[in-house]
């Protein structure tokens, strides 16, 4: 088995039931093409594509269009490299886990060949999964982001592996799109033992550092609301050897523009001010 050298880290895709599907089709095609370009520099076994939660938008209210669209997108990605998916708060009803969630339904019916739903593999609990030279340390939303109890044990038995935290939630001190700095969420100490954390949930791209561990949010793949910036939507690409990363933007012909004016005359005089670039 070849070592993993590259991880393409996506999050917060939010595929709708039927809304904006033309836009999503164009943008996700660009994403797949960019993933192919990045992965072409490696052997297929050396690349992983991670979706760090919120593949879909409407929790358990799903449509035929969504199931076809989401499964087609994942099939395209799994042709590029092995895909790892974790659940986010829009992929299930957190308060009613007795209901079958959308990710479980999708993976139970789609018969993916190279796409893995990590929460299901770990029996919907936090835990560690060894993947060649990487250990995926899942802080599962199904278990309220409990810290995996086996991190130290697995790290001791796999001393050369990269311990990568997977988390879809908020960290104390993270920043929302409106500029609010959160005082709720997981404390950074929860990620002790991880070499990095590949996170989702916050649509504002940002990097936090807690101790020696960087927590990276690539931001939403596609602009979701007027409250988000028009720019800086895409994903992160990781070099596993040194745990460095870079952000990749996906250009869009679509946008939700928040414009400020002092009076209607500003429109006539082209003096509108774009405030969410």
Locate the predicted segments by residue:
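N-terminal active-site segment of His-dependent metallophosphoesterases
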Residues: 1-73, 79, 150, 156-159
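His/Asp/Glu-rich metal-coordinating catalytic cores
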Residues: 3, 21, 60-216
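Conserved beta-strand elements of the Class I
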Residues: 8, 135-137, 236, 255
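Binuclear metal-dependent phosphoesterase catalytic core
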Residues: 129-130, 216-277
């Amino acid at each position: 088995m070849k070592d993993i050298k590259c991880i393409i880290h996506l999050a917060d895709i939010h595929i709708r039931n039927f809304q904006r599907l033309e836009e999503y089709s164009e943008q996700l095609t660009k994403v797949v093409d960019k993933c192919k370009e990045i992965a072409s520099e490696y052997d297929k076994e050396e690349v992983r594509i991670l979706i760090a939660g919120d593949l879909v938008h409407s929790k358990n209210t799903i449509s035929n269009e969504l199931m076809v669209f989401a499964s087609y997108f994942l099939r395209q990605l799994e042709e590029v490299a092995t895909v790892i998916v974790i659940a986010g708060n829009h992929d299930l009803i957190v308060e009613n886990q007795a209901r079958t969630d959308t990710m479980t339904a999708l993976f139970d019916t789609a018969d993916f060949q190279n796409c893995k739903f990590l929460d299901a593999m770990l029996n919907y609990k936090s835990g560690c999964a060894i993947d060649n030279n990487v250990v995926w340390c899942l802080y599962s939303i199904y278990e309220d982001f409990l810290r995996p109890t086996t991190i130290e044990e697995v790290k001791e038995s796999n001393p050369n592996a990269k311990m990568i935290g997977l988390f879809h939630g908020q960290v104390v001190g993270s920043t929302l799109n409106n500029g609010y700095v959160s005082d709720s969420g997981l404390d950074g100490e929860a990620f002790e033992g991880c070499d990095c954390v590949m996170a989702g949930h916050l649509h504002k791209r940002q990097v936090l550092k807690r101790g020696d561990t960087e927590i990276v949010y690539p931001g939403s793949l596609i602009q979701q609301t007027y409250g988000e910036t028009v720019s800086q939507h895409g994903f992160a690409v990781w070099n596993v050897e040194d745990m460095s990363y870079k952000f990749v933007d996906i250009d869009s012909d679509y946008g939700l523009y928040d414009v400020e004016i002092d009076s209607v005359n500003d429109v006539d005089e082209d003096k509108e001010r774009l405030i969410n670039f």
